[in-house]
Amino acid sequence: MIVGINGINIRGEKKKILSSLIALLKEKKFEVYLSEELSKTFNDSKIKLYSENNISKFDFIISFGGDGTLLNTVTSIGRKNIKILGVNVGKLGFLSFDVYDVFEKIIDDIQKNNYTLEKRSLVSLLPVNENINKNFALNEISVVKKDSSSMIKIHCYVDNQFICTYWSDGLIISTPTGSTGYSLSCGGPILTPESKNLLITPISPHNLSLRSIIIPDSAKIKLIIEKQKYNFLVSMDSRSYTFRGEQEFIIKKSNFNINLIQPNNFDFFETLRKKLNWGFDIRN
């Protein structure tokens, strides 16, 4: 099998762990490639490098890091339909499993085709600005104020039906995957990964009656940002772009999925309890 490994800023103890993982993969007869990004901080002249242009040959890609690395990996893969195995050596790693747990076992399971392939939906932004070459996000697309403490004013429509006008610091359009991220921090609910929904969550709304709305993921969201004298940001996961003046955007579910490799015994609610202390109560 052919596997690529992507990572960002791998130093110290992480280098030792990565060296051990590469040695294990080679021992199990994998052909291993490193991303150009990873080679900036982890250089091994014996291992070939890959770029976004030649990843279609891979059986899967290992995202070695935390959730930020996995989002970076998703950006590089895009529509290429390559499976991702998230290996957490970062802080939280909600979308990855901890490297210290079961790496060798899951590699054996992958060779035996004994794993679960979890399809995660994404959201896309239209129109595509000339400065935006990748208009999709696994977690969320957010519109956020930038240069001022003043609020921004966003008119929101779902399937051409007017919802309301948000006076706020911004607005988050989240997938089920992203429901445990930025949206959750802003008071949004948690959706299970297989949910066929999107979330609209305001950021610090001036109207206390405004809360998250759950809509079907077949819906098309139109946002009209009123003209103002300050810049604002449109962020897609970790990538941000600056806009000014009145703008109109369409946000909808992407026409492709991301495929995450999970152990057969993967339990979403166990992950919530373990990594977010969900339901933790000193009385239990």
Across the structure, where does each feature detected by a protein language model lie?
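ATP/NTP phosphate-donor binding region
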Residues: 1-60, 72, 100-116, 126-135
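Short glycine-rich anion-binding loops that position phosphate/pyrophosphate groups of nucleotides
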Residues: 10, 67-69, 90-92, 177-179
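Short glycine/serine/threonine-rich phosphate/pyrophosphate-binding segments
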Residues: 14-15, 69-73, 180-185
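A short helix->loop->beta-strand "cap" motif at the edges of active sites that frequently abuts
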Residues: 30, 79-82
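N-terminal glycine-rich "phosphate-gripper" loop used for MgATP/nucleotide binding
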Residues: 63-67, 75-76
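Catalytic core of DAGKc-family lipid kinases
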Residues: 90-169
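ATP/nucleoside-binding phosphotransfer catalytic cores, i.e., glycine-rich phosphate-binding loops
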Residues: 135, 143, 148, 159-162, ...
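Gly/Ser/Thr-rich active-site loops/lids in small-molecule metabolic enzymes
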Residues: 165-168, 173-209
